[in-house]
Amino acid sequence: MPKERRSRRRPQPIIRWVSLTLTLLALCQPIQTWRCSLSLGNQQWMTTYNQEAKFSISIDQILEAHNQSPFCPRSPRYTLDFVNGYPKIYWPPPQGRRRFGARAMVTYDCEPRCPYVGADHFDCPHWDNASQADQGSFYVNHQILFLHLKQCHGIFTLTWEIWGYDPLITFSLHKIPDPPQPDFPQLNSDWVPSVRSWALLLNQTARAFPDCAICWEPSPPWAPEILVYNKTISGSGPGLALPDAQIFWVNTSLFNTTQGWHHPSQRLLFNVSQGNALLLPPISLVNLSTVSSAPPTRVRRSPVAALTLGLALSVGLTGINVAVSALSHQRLTSLIHVLEQDQQRLITAINQTHYNLLNVASVVAQNRRGLDWLYIRLGFQSLCPTINEPCCFLRIQNDSIIRLGDLQPLSQRVSTDWQWPWNWDLGLTAWVRETIHSVLSLFLLALFLLFLAPCLIKCLTSRLLKLLRQAPHFPEISFPPKPDSDYQALLPSAPEIYSHLSPTKPDYINLRPCP
């Protein structure tokens, strides 16, 4: 960089842009770590000017969605900016200028928590601890960026933006070598039924990481395989309660962070020093003589458990039935009362109509008599012979009206009680009789179920045990036995949930050790 003429006046800050364009397409392989080291300094001790630097990677994919990624809760957040129409993403976000180049980026805890779901260009960029020192007349700000690159498409543009006077930049980029393969311990057993940990995890998670490489941690704690075996807690026997079923366990007594018995989890993402690992518990063996040789223990069952359950069920159903019956009885009584009112109104209307009809008949008879008297006075015969028509008379039947008056009230003709096989009238109200009927019926039903409960439970237990015994065999892995081994062979049985976990490698899975 050419040396500029200096004056006695206070030098003004000069913006220097350093843009390094690296073609990483040919170098990038799935999951490789590259160390990007950048050092910068000043030729003159600056005490009055603000200096700042920010590192950015210009890519063709917006990563705003990854800011809310649940797999990277503590990873550095991104800020998006557009320069000349192109997106530029900064790690970490700008937080204002500080003196002497002390950026807030040095305080970030950027341990990766990846892989990202759906990442196509890179995985988990994070910063190393920055080193700053005063070297005489130089001010040094050193930053190291680790890039976990995979499936790179296009060109990464690494840009270091510097505010200062005559900056000096040193840039280096090199690949971190892969760590050595772990050594497997010598296991004292003839054979152990086990399964590849990545196969178990991928089948349980239903391929939750379609675009990220799955790897395992090369340094302890590590687990290329897990041990699955059958451990029966208690034996089955006759009784009124369900016995304990056979449970399949994974021994993790050698795992540093977990002790005792532990079921395989679906989310075993562990953060390590230089990468990420999908871990399952390591293999450890258990002496079967201490597990299966002991006599099976049975939990003492309460003899009144079934009776208590039946009575509780009966009381609950009785309360529900009484409440429903009382509500139904009240609604039926209200309906009958309304119908009685309507019936009384109809009877009154019919009687009034009958009375009006009788009055009309009296008027007609009176008019007939008047016409007959008038015709006879004039020297004619009566009305009917004169007009040569038969005489008509109104005859009203009163039998239906009499029967309508003999009707009893509707409440006396309609019963509000349910029709039970046994029905009596002890002078009690309808609600009390209905409650007694409900209680007796449910009590008899509970007694009937108590007599059938042992048979039903026995049939269900035998069916479940039969299904458990039909589990398929599990893949076996052989280990060289030792003469002084105290371990015995484990049973190669496994539940049906592990039947599909054959160690077949998916196309998109890379089982190389994570850097």
UniProtKB/Swiss-Prot annotation:
Keywords: Cleavage on pair of basic residues, Coiled coil, Disulfide bond, Fusion of virus membrane with host cell membrane, Fusion of virus membrane with host membrane, Glycoprotein, Host cell membrane, Host membrane, Host-virus interaction, Lipoprotein, Membrane, Palmitate, Signal, Transmembrane, Transmembrane helix, Viral attachment to host cell, Viral envelope protein, Viral penetration into host cytoplasm, Virion, Virus entry into host cell. Residues 458-515 are cytoplasmic. Residues 34-436 are extracellular. The keyword Calcium does not apply. A lipid is attached at residue 455 (S-palmitoyl cysteine). Residues 365-381 are annotated as: Immunosuppression. A motif (CX6CC) lies at residues 384-392. Pfam families: TLV_coat. The record marks 301-302 as: Cleavage. Residues 330-376, 388-420 form a coiled coil. Residues 304-324 are annotated as: Fusion peptide. It comes from the Viruses. Residues 1-33 form the signal peptide. Specific enzymatic cleavages in vivo yield mature proteins. Envelope glycoproteins are synthesized as an inactive precursor that is N-glycosylated and processed likely by host cell furin or by a furin-like protease in the Golgi to yield the mature SU and TM proteins. The cleavage site between SU and TM requires the minimal sequence [KR]-X-[KR]-R. The CXXC motif is highly conserved across a broad range of retroviral envelope proteins. It is thought to participate in the formation of a labile disulfide bond possibly with the CX6CC motif present in the transmembrane protein. Isomerization of the intersubunit disulfide bond to an SU intrachain disulfide bond is thought to occur upon receptor recognition in order to allow membrane fusion. The chain crosses the membrane at residues 437-457. One of its GO terms (cellular component) is viral envelope. Glycans are attached at residues 129, 203, 230, 251, 256, 271, 287, 351, 398. The 17 amino acids long immunosuppressive region is present in many retroviral envelope proteins. Synthetic peptides derived from this relatively conserved sequence inhibit immune function in vitro and in vivo. The mature envelope protein (Env) consists of a trimer of SU-TM heterodimers attached by a labile interchain disulfide bond. The surface protein (SU) attaches the virus to the host cell by binding to its receptor. This interaction triggers the refolding of the transmembrane protein (TM) and is thought to activate its fusogenic potential by unmasking its fusion peptide. Fusion occurs at the host cell plasma membrane. This is Envelope glycoprotein.
